[in-house]
């Protein structure tokens, strides 16, 4: 997914945040695929975060909601604040939809301005039907996660939220 023009832009931006001049490092590589593979090998953390951010930018615009008039201040991204946010998201989905019993929240700062929060609450339980490594048929209960993305811009005071579902 990063072997594209937007993907390489995400890599270069993330590298700059970490004090790396990846534009210069990647300049002589002949293809997007070569550039992405080079970063995956030499700067795996940059590659991982750039992939996450690039993924957010490729999500369907249909499910994004925009809100202005947010307080123009830096959010609290401490572990305690992220834990409280995680618990609030989990509680919301448990109470309103009967899912979200567990949740993980990852936070990323992008180009020293944009705060991304990726929440992964549990979806409804299901059973995996398939074969294990020994070829034996198995039924395994599982709770896959679904994704909710929050993008906060403290300078403009805007919040964009991505949640796949019906129109609100």
Task: List where the protein language model places each region.
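C-terminal structured domains
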Residues: 128-150, 155-156, 163-168
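Intrinsically disordered, low-complexity polar/charged tails and linkers
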Residues: 1-142
């Amino acid at each position: 997914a990063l072997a594209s023009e937007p993907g390489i832009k995400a890599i270069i931006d993330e590298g700059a945040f970490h004090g790396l001049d990846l534009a210069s490092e990647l300049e002589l590589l002949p293809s997007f695929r070569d550039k992405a593979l080079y970063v995956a090998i030499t700067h795996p953390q940059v590659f991982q975060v750039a992939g996450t951010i690039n993924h957010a930018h490729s999500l369907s615009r249909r499910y994004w909601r925009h809100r202005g008039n947010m307080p123009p201040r830096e959010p609290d991204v401490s572990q305690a604040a992220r834990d409280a946010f995680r618990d609030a998201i989990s509680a919301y989905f448990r109470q309103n939809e009967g899912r979200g019993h567990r949740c993980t929240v990852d936070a990323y700062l992008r180009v020293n301005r944009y705060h991304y929060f990726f929440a992964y609450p549990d979806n409804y339980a299901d059973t995996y039907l398939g074969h294990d490594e020994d070829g034996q048929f198995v039924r395994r209960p599982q709770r896959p996660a679904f994704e909710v993305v929050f993008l906060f811009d403290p300078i403009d005071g805007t919040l964009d939220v991505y949640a796949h579902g019906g129109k609100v």
